[in-house]
């Protein structure tokens, strides 16, 4: 039986195999193509062309460079997503890590807390923001739950609370130094990505 191999270096989506959930996505796509009887060269070409940016997959681990720092924008809003994001970030070099996060008000209290419990083990700074739609929660309620989740954080030492998604993003960008990494968990996907793109353009 023939066997075929494609190195992760040939699949940009996986960032050389360091992004676990993208490796899984690539494997699933490969299996689907193979099951459909596609020629291996077609599958290989498709994997090489997978692009995961703000225009093709908005809010899905979009990576940017900002003054020599790495920005990641993602629409993750649950503990499983946080775990996957932390695993991905662990495979990326950085001097200091920061995270910008809000929470969906229609989630359970424990689910909101668990997000920052996970992030608190992996990031040095956390900026908590109240997003545009509280989804039935009182003002400040979601941010308070996020802060509770950081109560026993092993790594996060600096915590800020901000009202407004763009203000939170701007604060994070102001603090970034070359070699840092910032994970921005966006709420208003298109608007937030446009804001980040504008801020990056201002540095050009």
Label the predicted regions.
Residues 1-9:
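Acidic-glycine-rich active-site phosphate/pyrophosphate-binding loop
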Residues 12-19, 28-41, 45-204:
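ATP-dependent carboxylate-amine ligase
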